[in-house]
Amino acid sequence: MQLARSDSLCGCGSAIARLLIGLLAPVVLLLSTAEYASAQTLVHVKDTGVLRVGYRQDAQPFSYQDATAGAKGYSVALCQKIADAVKEKLQLPEIRTELVPVASEDDGVDAVRQGKIDLQCGATTATLGRRENVAFSIPIFPSGVGALMRKDAPVRMREILEGRPEPEQPRWRASLALIFQKRVFAVRAESTEEKWLREGVKKFHIIADIVPVADYGAGVDSIVERRADVLFGDRTVLLGAAARSSSADDLMVVERRFTNENLALALSRGDEDFRLLVDRTLSGLYSSGEIAELYKSFFGEPDEDALSFFRMNALPE
């Protein structure tokens, strides 16, 4: 009887053990998956010898396709520094940086989320909405929305966009909505600038046409050909697009920056080892002053505001 009871107890214990294993297995698997995710990029690079970098082909000077040298730009150069740091961290004799074109910043963010690329190196604004899907490095550049137009644009429209106060004469006492009524605003499709523009037009009750364009080149063409009155976009990118236009002498980018946004590099959420390496690499460039030479290559000599931005965003060791 005792033996039978012992067998019964063993059977019961085995059943309980199997039940516990069944209950705990998903938890163990989840923990293992999370642990792997935190190191997924470095593990992938160590296994394959490849770091996959997404870049925009039309976001000069941040990232663009050069006819002879391939992908170039400020963000691309930063990502190459990060690739060098990955190589050193993993003690690999060589790694290959695979450059993957993306159509827009949101496409790049989605590619990071899906694991198609390891790092998005473009002109990506770090927003809360995007942080639902990806993580971001420390800021790499201070940016914001700017406006490009023809130099012969209506004077009052230009003055308002430049932020000048209204003159006191009664003839200038027109509302914002009236001055911009039936104007055509071009903006890059599916961008943070498009969202900002649509919200602004609605807020100020402006009756205007918003025309999304595929890229900055198409937007500049719409201004040159008078199909649009104003092109809104990242101010730094607008400056580059205007300078490259064959009608550059007819174009201007207003001094005003309508928003203050930090650009950053997008990477996978939960990938803390890789994010630490990225932030440490960037902080090293900022703290050492090496960033000044890299900045100069794409934007000209950095002013005190730019240098202060890098000093403020460098993380201490």
What do the PLM-derived regions correspond to, one by one?
Residues 87-101, 181-182, 201-214, 227, ...:
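A local structural motif
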Residues 39-123, 128, 132, 167, ...:
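Extracytoplasmic small-molecule ligand-binding "clamshell" domains
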Residues 40-42, 92-103, 124-126, 132-189:
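A conserved helix-loop-strand patch within extracytoplasmic ligand-binding domains
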Residues 17-32:
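Bacterial N-terminal signal peptides
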Residues 55-59, 101-105, 115-127, 150-151, ...:
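Beta->alpha turn/N-cap motifs
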Residues 57, 140-156, 235, 242-282, ...:
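Periplasmic-binding protein-like
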Residues 106, 121-133, 196-203, 217, ...:
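A ligand-binding cleft/hinge motif common to bilobed small-molecule-binding domains
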Residues 76-86, 150-174, 180-184, 191, ...:
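Extended ligand-binding regions for polar small-molecule ligands
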